[in-house]
Amino acid sequence: MPRRKGLCLFLQMLLLHLYGVCQAQPNYQVFDLLSVSVQRQVTSFLQSALSNPSMNEVYVLSTFKLQPKSTVTLFGLYSTSDNSRFFEFTVMGRLNKASLRYLRSDGKLHSVFFNKLDIADGKQHALLLHLSGLHRGATFAKLYIDCNPTGVVEDLPRPLSGIRLNTGSVHLRTLQKKGQDSMDELKLVMGGTLSEVGAIQECFMQKSEAGQQTGDVSRQLIGQITQMNQMLGELRDVMRQQVKETMFLRNTIAECQACGLGPDFPLPTKVPQRLATTTPPKPRCDATSCFRGVRCIDTEGGFQCGPCPEGYTGNGVICTDVDECRLNPCFLGVRCINTSPGFKCESCPPGYTGSTIQGIGINFAKQNKQVCTDTNECENGRNGGCTSNSLCINTMGSFRCGGCKPGYVGDQIKGCKPEKSCRHGQNPCHASAQCSEEKDGDVTCTCSVGWAGNGYLCGKDTDIDGYPDEALPCPDKNCKKDNCVYVPNSGQEDTDKDNIGDACDEDADGDGILNEQDNCVLAANIDQKNSDQDIFGDACDNCRLTLNNDQRDTDNDGKGDACDDDMDGDGIKNILDNCQRVPNVDQKDKDGDGVGDICDSCPDIINPNQSDIDNDLVGDSCDTNQDSDGDGHQDSTDNCPTVINSNQLDTDKDGIGDECDDDDDNDGIPDTVPPGPDNCKLVPNPGQEDDNNDGVGDVCEADFDQDTVIDRIDVCPENAEITLTDFRAYQTVVLDPEGDAQIDPNWIVLNQGMEIVQTMNSDPGLAVGYTAFNGVDFEGTFHVNTMTDDDYAGFIFGYQDSSSFYVVMWKQTEQTYWQATPFRAVAEPGIQLKAVKSKSGPGEHLRNALWHTGDTNDQVRLLWKDPRNVGWKDKVSYRWFLQHRPQVGYIRARFYEGTELVADSGVTVDTTMRGGRLGVFCFSQENIIWSNLKYRCNDTIPEDFQAFQAQQFSS
């Protein structure tokens, strides 16, 4: 009785305490972010927190379950306009880490990492993220998993400080249920203490000094609850004793009934002597004497019950079920179900075979353990599902796919193919082909210079345009017979389909009129009608009634610019279009000079005349010519002002060039330093998935820059902006723009930008592509298709402006330039490599300096000259190979005549231009063909440069 009173008194005290706690008003706000209505108001919630100086603490609470090794974003806040991040929390299961990214006050993203988190394991976890210091004090982020602190990062930049959010400018994205991934709770708590917020997840934590009192109350409450549990346990024992006593009374009453003494039997006031000394009869067996199924035996001392049935334990009167599952009769990992009586084991787990078992009793459970035998999935006739010719490795209850079998190369994604090698005896290439081994283990065969085909079969290629003189027995395009054996035409154009290429067909259109007299060389027109009296007949004139000898057609709609009222095809008439030759529907013009931003050479400075005297695509009004790193981009527009990066590649478009950006793709994994290196530095993949463990992430396997062109044929595998060689878009640069007999070059581009023809005996000029390069390999076939002239032709690289570029030029014979002003210039026969750095720019000084073989002060330096002094031959094809590595100044040029190497500059080092654009060059020479042009990004330093340096240091 005293104990019961104590229990009641304790319960009263506990209720009073809880009442007092409940009466306290919380000083925080809780928002359920999984509620649709709350999601719609998330912008106002955030703005309230950011603008309220007293709101210094923010908590995010989440309960979730993630499948093993998964990488998911649990929750994030994003801009509705451009989908940029404001706040994002991502779990990277494969790396056992999590990342928190948020917008700093300077508008840039800051990344925080929490390591050693094993929370992507198929189990439910509770997360509490505490951000402190929104407005004052030190800013830190602390993470709790399942009520336990798992990481803290201190001295952080303030998140979202000073940022104004408009209504509807932010939207919330949360983890969506997919497979085993699910989220049951996501709450935002503004304000409050750690212990108060932790209690929402039933976590009892103390914060620090300010929350010490609350922590003490929580500990007192826990102690009182523990004491109450002990008293309830004692009460349970008392009740069990009362049950036993009740059972004893029941048996006593049963004995009284067996003596025939009912409840109404009158008891005498005085017990007779005979009756008082009579021993009452012992209880006899009846239907309720023993537990069901237990045998009851009458004895002199009363009834006696036999043993409890199998699967039960007790005295025969009371029998309770035995829990056989305590003996672990089931196979490891199989669920045991206790029944009354007996037990049952469920089916064997996946990857095992065996039967289910069920039985009754301790002995059965001890003697009959469930047996599950491992299934060898690798012997199912399908190699376990692994790719053919790869290793299938059986494991207990499962299997895994390994690498390729010996003699095969590849992986589980691309398959395992028979190993190819360039080693002797395994080289599959033609005897006149070069063999190279790729990263994926495959082999590439390329026909050598002067040969053409698919690499496995090669035939003689006299004009070195990539097509053999005779057809080869292979289906590839480059196995077909060259339709112009002695004139390079890498596009194999044949207008009249007579199997004679246009380049060598005297009547290319087959209209019976020779090309020299035909006013439509590539369009049959026997009548030669020419309404506007320009040099093009009506059949091929894109402006039949308007004289336009240039036939320029910006939008390629078949209507020449001269008669097209919308030259760029953007739907805006020329008279109203602020960029007449560049499509710009928006017509943006931020400097208001009447020239649209997209075609404005100074988009931030008024310059309506668009003057660009040095032809560097930067208007004179904003051209500073201050270039600290020498890569051709002035410091004010260079995305890496002090690091050489002529290509200006900026993969993540953050305004920082890849060359000086430590995280090119902005996925939170640094390119080189820990926790990197990033196995896909140009494609976001925070999880770093790499199923075949080859060091290249799955997302960029075989296409490193994700430009949809596989690396094997991609001319720039690490630059998504350059995929194929293409000079269809080019800039013309006239190097002697003034004079009485001015003749500018006439450029024709063929074969989808891989062939250029110049037809005029012209003043010096360039055709320059718009693509800029860092390191580059540049090759092509050079051919002068005439016998009537003997002047200069060549190519350029490292072009930065009309005063700064490298040129490789070839003169046929010795000759003094016909104009001796401003100085006498003498050209010698042979190949010359020059660095042009002209103070005067295009004009007579640069013209004569280019003609002259040698150095010219303030104009040109001669870096190398072919000592043979041999000029080019009429109607003979030559193949050149150029290597330029501007980061170290490495230059090397080689020339082939047929299959023979005829000139080699060797290693030449010059750092005048640190990268730039590519193009071709002519000076007073007509009918030049640059065919089968190819460029490829390449920053790898050649081996001969190391030997060159060693030789230089030793001398």
Curated annotation (Swiss-Prot):
Signal sequence region: 1-24
Residue spans of the TSP type-3 repeats: 460-492, 493-528, 529-551, 552-587, 588-610, 611-648, 649-688, 689-724
Biased composition (Polar residues): 637-649
Matches recorded under Pfam families: COMP, EGF_CA, TSP_3, TSP_C
Residues annotated as domain Laminin G-like: 25-192
Domain TSP C-terminal stretches: 728-942
Keywords from the named record: Calcium, Cell adhesion, Disulfide bond, EGF-like domain, Endoplasmic reticulum, Extracellular matrix, Glycoprotein, Growth factor, Mitogen, Repeat, Sarcoplasmic reticulum, Secreted, Signal, Unfolded protein response
Single GO cellular component term: extracellular space
Disulfide cysteine pairs (residue numbers): 285-296, 290-305, 308-319, 325-336, 330-345, 348-372, 378-392, 386-401, 404-416, 422-435, 429-445, 447-458, 474-479, 484-504, 520-540, 543-563, 579-599, 602-622, 640-660, 680-700, 716-937
Main location as per UniProt: endoplasmic reticulum
Annotated spans, Disordered: 610-678
InterPro entries noted in UniProt: ConA-like_dom_sf, EGF-like_Ca-bd_dom, EGF-like_dom, EGF_Ca-bd_CS, Growth_fac_rcpt_cys_sf, NOTCH1_EGF-like, Thrombospondin_3-like_rpt, Thrombospondin_3_rpt
Biased composition (Acidic residues): 657-668
Residues carrying a glycan: 609, 938
Subunit architecture: Homotrimer; disulfide-linked.
Physiological role: Adhesive glycoprotein that mediates cell-to-cell and cell-to-matrix interactions and may be involved in various processes including cellular proliferation, migration, adhesion and attachment. May play a role in ER stress response. May participate in the genesis and function of cardiac and skeletal muscle.
Family: Belongs to the thrombospondin family.
Descriptive protein name: Thrombospondin-4
